[in-house]
Amino acid sequence: MGDRDLDSQTMIPVQPGSLVIRMDGAFDIDSVQVIRERIEALPVETEVYVDLSRVREFHDRAVALLAEVLAVARARVFVRGLRQHQYRMLRYLGVLPSALDPGLARPALER
């Protein structure tokens, strides 16, 4: 997304095969598109942590689209930083609790 503010998202390699996508500001449809594009460009075996803890405003439609992204993602994707409403929405839309990761660290043996 060419007009997306670059300060609103950051990609941080955590370890080989693992990446954090950190979003801030408003979580809107453009934000989901950024996440979708990043995830689609990664190898299948990559673990992706989407960190929404710095988001000030969540758009419900964007949260619903995020559920769709999580459903079709080839990479393993975990989301953190959700507020209760967004967590409940994602659960209602079929996202497993194991994908709604409360932290960024995941032991290698836990699969």
Identify the residue ranges that each predicted region occupies:
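STAS-like cytosolic regulatory interaction modules
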Residues: 1-111
